[in-house]
Amino acid sequence: YTRRAFLNGKLGLTQAEAVMDLISADGRQGAALANAALGGALAKKINAQKAQLTALQAHLAAWVDFPEEDVPEVSQAELIATLSEQRDTLDQLIAGYGAGAVLRRGVDCVLLGRPNVGKSTLLNLLAGFDRAIVTPVAGTTRDIVEQAVQLGSVRLNLFDTAGVREVGADGDAIEAEGIRRSWKKLDEAGLILAVFDGSERPTREDLELAQRCAGRPAIALVNKEDKPTRFDAELIAPYFAMVLPVCCQEEGARKVIAAAVARLLGTSQIDPHAASLSGQRQLSAATRARDAVAGALDAAQGLGLDAVSVCVDDALDALCELTGENASEAVINEVFERFCVGK
């Protein structure tokens, strides 16, 4: 039905994609983003850009092709201002893609730390019920425990992992396999919550974990804030986006963590009712358009109006592909392959 609506001109391609996004959205914010796209928010924004670029291209073509006619001269200052505005608009759309994807589909979040630092307690706090077994015995969690939770505006697919520590050659083979899986999950995660015991001094395992988190979307949680602090957070701070003292046994920690996650992932800056890009197809087309506009801007400052015109043509082609006006049959088929029968 959605494909038929697209082929009959009732829906644009971005609106058709929004139907599937709405069906598969995780949480209210993701649904709001999809609903905005279904209402035409993205299409209207892109169409406005196309109208400005088309008007600019017509002026350029008239000036270049009919120099003997009384065509108003193309002002370099106005040209640069128009192209800069177009580039900035596309930059904003592209910059918001990652956070929008998180709101739409959620993010895989791994809980990592030494044994008995409070990872499973954290999982239970975020889940809102006793999902994992918690005991004073180190190494209680040996395999990965999964749980999806809604944390503020973000859906987290949580993975509580085995405590990471050094296991000798003659150590427990099951625990060693659990630790191997923990490190593997770190490499796959879109978000890392690294847990440290605030009542103890940092260990070699703590520092190794911190170093492995460097350059990744990671938050350090120094747990057991309710006990005297012995942990020197400055030793791990360089490796994390932020370091938070928390007590995972207190409900208030959930709000603190939710705010930090939203800040790190950029979801707190997203207006769910505004235009946003969804999926690699849209991102790729918008990126090509942005690069073409940037090329036109460079050309306007040295190469001449012919080069500007070529780049503006490329930008218009990319924007028309984004909205579906000149999308190939293969692209259209790929979009609608995501739909199940009856949608």
Language-model features: locations:
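N-terminal accessory targeting/assembly segments
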Residues: 1-15, 26
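C-terminal-of-GTPase-core extension/linker across diverse P-loop GTPases
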Residues: 12, 17, 28-150, 156, ...
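Phosphate/Mg2+-binding loops and adjacent switch elements
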Residues: 21
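Terminal RNA-binding accessory module
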Residues: 123, 154-157, 183, 193-194
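Conserved active-site aspartate in kinases
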Residues: 160
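Inter-motif core of Ras-like GTPase G domains
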Residues: 175-199
